[in-house]
Amino acid sequence: MRIIFMGTPDFAVPTLEALVAAGHDVVAAYSQPPRPAGRGKKLQPSPVHLAAEAHGIDVRTPVSLKGADEQTTLAAFDADVAVVAAYGLILPQAVLDAPRLGCLNVHGSLLPRWRGAAPVQRAILAGDEMTGVTIMQMERGLDTGPMLARIETPVDGKTAGDLTAELAVKGAALMVQVLADLASYPAVVQPEQGVTYAHKIDKAESRLDFTRDAVDVERQVRAFSPAPGAFFELEGERYRVLAAEVLGVAGEPGVTVDDVLAIACGTGAIRPTLIQRAGRPAMDTASLLRGRAIPGGTRLG
């Protein structure tokens, strides 16, 4: 098939690679424009941009697809289908209608649960036991289109980073499978029951809330690991907690209950197992405490 690919972050790269490996003619790759990154704030192309260039695919990085010129350019690629994975731009109706078979999306949840920008993080925060990937036909609504295929996977205590990587690979394989035999995947309208929305993550959400149950706090850690990183502050310094364990001890929320960084929560406690100080590499908690003692009775913010 002649395919336009549309995606931006690491999550989208396995789908692009799978389409190329399956022998499809990826005639163009659309990705968000390069963004400033690193200490020097040098413009950095997206992961999809770099992957597409490595395959010699024409890359386009418009800031919007609402203009007539961009829509004309896209239509001129004469694609059979557009495959979309975490692109990040709204697709106007003219873009949705341009490919002969429309636009198919790889979405990181079991729709209709967790429509929106942050399905993996929201699934972890909610304590979902299962999540997955849905291949859907795109329409103007936010992840409301009919579904062609789904595949499930257990959350199983995974971090957002681990779960996103797993879903990216599963979604890529499922998209290739669907494109190989579209007739075998009739579109099914999403049910009205069970709809939830995965609102974009606000960085303020990553501050650890020790007034909550320890189980919820540990989910908060996993949902924001590796980025932006759930954190607490001590004496003006930020500590990012990248992994933690739940403990059955009690104390005043936000106060350490021993000398090895067990932190009391509303119910129970957590102990970070992987932690990162500002400007330093991540380390296990024992290594941290060898260089920076945090005695019992210390209040964390």
UniProtKB/Swiss-Prot annotation:
TM region positions: none
GO molecular function: methionyl-tRNA formyltransferase activity
Any one cellular-component term (Gene Ontology): cytosol
Signal sequence annotation: none
Matching InterPro entries: Fmt, Formyl_trans_C, Formyl_transf_N, Formyl_transf_N_sf, Formyl_transferase-like_C_sf, Met-tRNA-FMT_C, Met-tRNA-FMT_N
Binding positions ((6S)-5,6,7,8-tetrahydrofolate): S109, L110, L111, P112
Catalyzed reactions per annotation: L-methionyl-tRNA(fMet) + (6R)-10-formyltetrahydrofolate = N-formyl-L-methionyl-tRNA(fMet) + (6S)-5,6,7,8-tetrahydrofolate + H(+)
Keyword annotations: Protein biosynthesis, Transferase
Pfam families xref list: Formyl_trans_C (PF02911), Formyl_trans_N (PF00551)
EC number(s) per entry: 2.1.2.9
Similarity comment: Belongs to the Fmt family.
HAMAP family the UniProt entry points to: Formyl_trans
Role noted for this protein: Attaches a formyl group to the free amino group of methionyl-tRNA(fMet). The formyl group appears to play a dual role in the initiator identity of N-formylmethionyl-tRNA by promoting its recognition by IF2 and preventing the misappropriation of this tRNA by the elongation apparatus.
Entry-linked PANTHER family: METHIONYL-TRNA FORMYLTRANSFERASE, METHIONYL-TRNA FORMYLTRANSFERASE, MITOCHONDRIAL
Protein name listed in UniProt: Methionyl-tRNA formyltransferase
Organism of derivation: Novosphingobium aromaticivorans (strain ATCC 700278 / DSM 12444 / CCUG 56034 / CIP 105152 / NBRC 16084 / F199)
Phylogenetic placement of the source organism: Bacteria, Pseudomonadati, Pseudomonadota, Alphaproteobacteria, Sphingomonadales
